[in-house]
């Protein structure tokens, strides 16, 4: 239910900001006007180079570098062509992942119970068991610290780790990024909330994987020049392999009966 609600919220947010994209869409039309093309191209290149220089002044080991990197776009970017802004987003995202990976490594050094309490604090999880202990102030503050600086915690079958908060980026930049980037972020957030594999096995219904295959197939077809087309293609390929070939602990065929396992039979019927 949490996954469904989050997806709906993100989708509504996406629709709500379409009207605000009018300026950017007009700016895209300007790029096709030869009399303005070179001027706009030079202007946008300056934006990109200035941002790259700015990122070089920020520390990848400092989590507060994330809001600094994204708040750079608070002013002076209202009329920039959103295809060019997507390149700026790519620079931000690359930097974001470096900071996230550092924080992930730091978090992995905590004892498991410490990780669990921080996770419980972030998502306000409680328990009625007698021996349950509520997160302390330090754990609560750490959870807030991560969230306020654009990072999230994921818990996959008890494995807790620092992960991306795509809602953070989307909310901050929704009026500037292109529609494909919007769709890309929404889909990544949805999939990060429900990972499809663990321990060499498929842990979601085959229908879920089928829907992702359809989404990425259409997305790639409609956005051939997308800045993250390679990443989108990789996801598309991964889901197809899982769907049609299964995984070590989720085989397509039952060796003993020499027939399709029921979950794959249902999945194939669904996609047909």
Indicate residue ranges for each PLM-predicted region:
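Short solvent-exposed coil/turn linkers within tandem alpha-helical repeat scaffolds
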Residues: 82-83, 171-179, 219-230, 271-272
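Bacterial signal peptide processing site
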Residues: 18-20
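Short coil/linker segments at helix-helix boundaries
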Residues: 113, 117-125, 132-135, 141-142, ...
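C-terminal motif of bacterial Sec signal peptides marking the signal peptidase cleavage site
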Residues: 13-16
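Structural signature of alpha-solenoid helical repeat junctions
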Residues: 208-211, 227-231
């Amino acid at each position: 239910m949490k996954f469904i609600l989050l997806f709906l919220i993100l989708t509504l947010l996406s629709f709500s900001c379409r009207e605000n994209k009018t300026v950017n869409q007009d700016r895209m039309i300007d790029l096709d006007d030869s009399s303005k093309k070179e001027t706009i191209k030079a202007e946008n290149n300056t934006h990109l180079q200035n941002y790259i220089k700015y990122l070089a002044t920020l520390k990848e080991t400092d989590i507060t570098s994330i809001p600094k990197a994204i708040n750079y776009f608070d002013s002076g970017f209202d009329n920039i062509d959103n295809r060019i802004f997507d390149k700026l987003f790519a620079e931000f995202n690359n930097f974001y992942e470096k900071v996230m990976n550092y924080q992930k490594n730091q978090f992995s050094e905590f004892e498991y119970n410490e990780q669990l309490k921080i996770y419980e604090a972030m998502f306000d999880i409680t328990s009625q068991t007698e021996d349950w202990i509520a997160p302390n102030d330090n754990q609560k503050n750490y959870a807030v610290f991560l969230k306020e600086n654009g990072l999230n915690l994921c818990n996959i079958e008890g494995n807790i780790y620092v992960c991306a908060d795509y809602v953070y980026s989307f909310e901050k930049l929704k009026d500037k990024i292109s529609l494909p980037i919007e769709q890309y972020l929404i889909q990544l957030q949805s999939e990060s909330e429900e990972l499809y594999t663990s321990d060499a096995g498929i842990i979601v219904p085959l229908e879920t994987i089928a829907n992702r295959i359809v989404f990425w197939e259409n997305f790639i077809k409609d956005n051939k020049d997308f800045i993250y087309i390679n990443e989108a293609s990789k996801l598309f390929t991964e889901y197809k392999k899982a769907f049609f070939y299964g995984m070590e602990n989720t085989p397509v065929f039952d060796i003993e009966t020499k027939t399709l396992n029921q979950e794959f039979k249902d999945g194939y019927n669904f996609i047909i």
